[in-house]
UniProtKB/Swiss-Prot annotation:
Species per Swiss-Prot/TrEMBL record: Chlorobaculum parvum (strain DSM 263 / NCIMB 8327) (Chlorobium vibrioforme subsp. thiosulfatophilum)
Subcellular location: Cytoplasm
Alphabetical list of SUPFAM superfamilies matching this protein: GroES-like (SSF50129)
Quaternary organization: Heptamer of 7 subunits arranged in a ring. Interacts with the chaperonin GroEL.
Protein name: Co-chaperonin GroES
Annotated keywords: Chaperone, Cytoplasm
Gene: groES
HAMAP family to which the protein is assigned, alphabetical: CH10
Lineage, highest ranks first: Bacteria, Pseudomonadati, Chlorobiota, Chlorobiia, Chlorobiales
Amino acid sequence: MNLKPLADRVIVKPAPAEEKTKGGLYIPDTGKEKPQYGEVVAVGEGKVADNGQLVQMQVKVGDKVLYGKYSGTEVQVEAEDYLIMRESDIFAILG
């Protein structure tokens, strides 16, 4: 992937949607929930604060993160789906 986010933006590869329920029933494509977690694949340089200093990003490439259901903008690069979002749209880093 040749995509570099700017400023405080992050590119996340969403986790695949669940194919079947815990009970073993297969979920049709129309019934699948969007995953709300994924892996960070690229990060920007950071945000410039009001005082002119660069605020470093807290997330890094490889982090597993939780984000809001409607966070980010969906993009497709080389037949892969990604989300571009601001770091502030990320709720938590999974340990």
